[in-house]
C-alpha cells in the first residue's frame, strides 16, 4: 500500500485563496494531495466541516500530520519555515513581506476574489457591488503595478517570497472571468506573472486543484 502523502490540502479549483497554498506546495516540491471541497453546494457550511475541518467555515485548510492550519497566509508561513524556501532575507524584508501580504489580503485579492465570484458564480448579478469592487481594484492594482515596476519581487528581495505567492492567488484565472485582462492592463504585473510562471513547479490553478470544470471532482 502506498504511503499517505505528507500534506493534504482541502481546496477546490475556483479558489484563489486555496491556489496560493497549492502553488506553494508544488513550488517547494512537497509530497501533497488535494482534497476536493464541494464549496458551491455548501460543504463549508456543514456542521461536520466546521466541527472536524475548520470552525471558520473556510478553505484552504492544510493538514500536516496531526496539525491543521487555515488562512492562506498562515499556511504559506508554515510551509516557508518548514522548507526554508520563499523566505525573506533579514528583519527588514520580513516586515516588508508581511506588509505586502496584508495589503494583498485586504486590498488586492481581498477585492479580486469577491469581484470574480459576483461576476461568475453568484445566483444573481449585483451591478452596484461589482462597480464598487472594480473601482477599488483599479486603484489597488495600480499600486501593485507601480511597486513591481521598481522591483522584480514584491518584498524588494532578490528572489520571490511568500508575498509573491500570496499575490499570485487570483491572477492566473482566465481574463474572461474578470471582464478585464490584468496582465495587459497592468504591464508590470503582467511581467511579474511571467516570472512566477517560470518557477519550477508552477501550474495553473485548474491543473493543480480538483473541481474544474465546475461540478466535477
Say what each PLM segment does:
Residues 12, 38, 162, 209-212:
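Short, solvent-exposed turn/loop segments enriched in Gly/Ser/Thr/Pro and often Arg
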Residues 74, 188, 201:
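Residue-level recognition of oxygen-bearing side chains
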Residues 100-198:
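GST-like fold's C-terminal all-alpha helical module
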Residues 1-131, 135:
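GST-like domain detector, emphasizing the conserved glutathione-binding G-site
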Amino acid at each position: 500500500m502506498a504511503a499517505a502523502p505528507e500534506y493534504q490540502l482541502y481546496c477546490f479549483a475556483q479558489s484563489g485563496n486555496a491556489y496560493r497554498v497549492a502553488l506553494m506546495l508544488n513550488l517547494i516540491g512537497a509530497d501533497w494531495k488535494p482534497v476536493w471541497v464541494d464549496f458551491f453546494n455548501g460543504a463549508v457550511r456543514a456542521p461536520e466541516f466546521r466541527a472536524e475541518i475548520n470552525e471558520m467555515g473556510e478553505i484552504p485548510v492544510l493538514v500536516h500530520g496531526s496539525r491543521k492550519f487555515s488562512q492562506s497566509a498562515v499556511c504559506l508561513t508554515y510551509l516557508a519555515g518548514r522548507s526554508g524556501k520563499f523566505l525573506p532575507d533579514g528583519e527588514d524584508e520580513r516586515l516588508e513581506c508581511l506588509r505586502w501580504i496584508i495589503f494583498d489580503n485586504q486590498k488586492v485579492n481581498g477585492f479580486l476574489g469577491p469581484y470574480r465570484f459576483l461576476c461568475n458564480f453568484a445566483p444573481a448579478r449585483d451591478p452596484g457591488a461589482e462597480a464598487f469592487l472594480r473601482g477599488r481594484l483599479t486603484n489597488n492594482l495600480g499600486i501593485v503595478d507601480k511597486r513591481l515596476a521598481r522591483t522584480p519581487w514584491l518584498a524588494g528581495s532578490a528572489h520571490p517570497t511568500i508575498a509573491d505567492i500570496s499575490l499570485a492567488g487570483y491572477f492566473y484565472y482566465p481574463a474572461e472571468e474578470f471582464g478585464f485582462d490584468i496582465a495587459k492592463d497592468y504591464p508590470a504585473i503582467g511581467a511579474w506573472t511571467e516570472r512566477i510562471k517560470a518557477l519550477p513547479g508552477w501550474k495553473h490553478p485548474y491543473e493543480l486543484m480538483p473541481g474544474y470544470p465546475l461540478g466535477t471532482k
